[in-house]
């Protein structure tokens, strides 16, 4: 019986050591991968997961006006499984308009606009085609002097 007890004890200690070492290794790797630019603050709401959604559904403008003084001009609101980051003001929203497609994709939002123009046009095409269509639209809509 003593042999089984010591074998179990040694195995348990070995497993604990492996988990501790694995945790240390993964935590050191995750610290190295952190972004140089800090992420925007996240709105903490109660109850978790649905608190932000409830406030957002009551009035998104009210939520923005209440949280802007507390969280600043850039902050994130968690709505169920989605994160929505708000950029308030011209000094921070310029990045939104000038960002590369690889940095800031609007693909999910464009899906809602497909019925407006139809399939294969503007919001239902790849980025290079969309940019070409935007150039065409902008030149067609310019006022000639």
From Swiss-Prot:
A molecular function GO annotation: iron ion binding
Chief location bin: membrane
GO BP annotations, alphabetical order: methylation
SUPFAM superfamilies found in the cross-reference section: Cytochrome P450 (SSF48264)
Tissue: Expressed specifically in roots.
Membrane topology term: Single-pass membrane protein
Record localization: Membrane
InterPro entries: CYP450_sterol_14alpha_dmase (IPR050529), Cyt_P450_E_grp-IV (IPR002403), Cyt_P450_sf (IPR036396)
Record's keyword terms, sorted: Heme, Iron, Membrane, Metal-binding, Methyltransferase, Transferase, Transmembrane, Transmembrane helix
Reported consequences of knocking out the gene: No visible phenotype.
Domain of life of the organism encoding this protein: Eukaryota
Transmembrane regions listed in the UniProt entry: 5-25
Cellular component aspect of the GO annotation: membrane
Family: Belongs to the cytochrome P450 family.
Protein name: Putative sterol 14-demethylase-like protein
């Amino acid at each position: 019986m003593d042999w089984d007890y010591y074998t179990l004890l040694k195995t348990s200690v070995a497993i604990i050591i492996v988990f501790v070492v694995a945790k240390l290794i993964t935590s050191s790797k995750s610290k190295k991968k952190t972004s140089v630019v800090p992420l925007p603050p996240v709105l903490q709401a109660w109850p978790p997961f649905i608190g932000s959604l409830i406030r957002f559904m009551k009035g998104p403008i009210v939520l923005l006006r209440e949280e802007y003084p507390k969280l600043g001009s850039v902050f994130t609101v968690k709505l169920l499984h989605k994160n929505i980051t708000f950029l308030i003001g011209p000094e921070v929203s310029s990045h939104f308009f000038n960002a590369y497609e690889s940095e800031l994709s609007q693909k999910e939002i464009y899906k809602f606009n497909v019925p407006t123009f139809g399939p294969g046009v503007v919001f239902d095409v790849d980025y290079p085609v969309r940019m070409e269509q935007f150039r065409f639209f902008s030149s067609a809509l310019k006022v000639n002097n």
